[in-house]
């Protein structure tokens, strides 16, 4: 009987498979072996696409005469730095006594690509090939993955999408970077007084640059509008409460052009005149005209996917997206959490049925022990599969990031940043087994001289899930409001239960005692700059930038890049100095070079800056992976796009106009 060969993506994962198999494994050079099985590993990518000069030496020199470069058949080669390990893996794949190959690379598009390239380059034939697809690296999950492994051919569509993604990035990168560099490097070099300038272009990278530059320009062009709100102090049961004027239908200022959004005067003198009118004799006390009492519930948020985790870590801890991904990968490899590169924020039905194991394990984690025990004692995990936190239709490759309830031997060795990330994953997970938080809210409207003032009050009646979610550092508010929203929202004063009872006793028609009348100056605020976390979310939700409803519906679920690549793209843009990332605040801004590159692309291949195009390409890859369109159909469109756009750039002669654009942009970067 032949042996089984297990091939993982990296050595640490291979060791976990070897442990789970419980064979008497002997360490060899680049693999482990027992009488029954062999376990080996890649070290990330072992094979890559060949540079153009491998096809023909004429392509080594950049020239407009040799583009567009679109090979009929793509060439691949082993990466020099990992040739030894490739030789070992290739030899094992082709060993006569190896009968079955278990592909154990990461369960996703990129993991599939890593293995398929190795198999292609090694020329593997005549073997049974199985795909192990797992969501965590616990022993049970590894054994389940092996037991339920499907034939590798079931993942051929995913493999096609992986190959296409690489070809797309390769063709756009080589052709567009060469075309734009050859056409526009001179004006860039000349303007910046540098020795060389390469215009780096990428399907996703250039689109992200466009989003950041466009946001920066919105901020520059924003004209602030000052306004003056009118505030009234009212005494209620010994408390000084602030009420705010609003131009309701009864007001003489209703829909007046002098008013900004119903609650502020555009001119200070108008605000002063209004206050004088209210203070004129005979004075009036405010009379209660409206009291509304209601309960408001706040449900636990959905579970973390990678983008949401990166966003929260950026806001809470000022950790960059690539660092968050590194930590999430570390937690996964230490068996503490499930697979990190996921877009889903829900669980699968199958996982939901076994979720008590995850919760039970968390009784060994001091931060969560009390909550885990409470959930198990109350049985609140039962029926979770009937809630919004479980939805098989919203899962493509993997469910949300959750704790496994295992791996606690590694907890003490975690870096403090990793420990914090683990804690918020645990808290988010346990939150979904608690009820909604309940607020008692009262809004009061009073009238004085026919003008209305309102105020709102609330008390937390039942903390529900908040007692789990908002402890420790996680108490910081993770929702972001613009400054304008903060200024304009009707203020709801947090109050205690006894004062809420006093408020509840108030009745319509009752007189209250007026205190000071004052004006408060405010101003409209420009859009916020992206931070590293909000940028990741914007990339994930590219559809929000699309006004056409039909097109937005078509690309729903497709963002810019993937959960596995977004952080790396941001990192690259910072590395090549197109973007600047403030490490302390995580705020992202363009550099002068980045804005100049934006101008070059805008004048030559503008669609590359458009989230609609980038998201539609990503949607196409998803359709290939699901078998809805063929690899050939996708490739025809890709070839046509690259050919047309490259040839168009070759015919352009707009370099002189760029200097004016460069000069205009540079004024915003002078120190």
Identify the meaning behind each predicted range.
Residues 1-178, 265, 384, 526:
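Intrinsically disordered, low-complexity regulatory segments
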Residues 255-302, 310:
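Metal- or metallocofactor-binding catalytic centers and their adjacent structured scaffolds
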Residues 14-22, 116-117, 209-219, 427:
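Short active-site loop/helix that positions an aromatic residue
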Residues 191-200, 211-267, 316, 340:
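C-terminal helical "lid" subdomain and adjoining coupling/linker elements of P-loop NTPases
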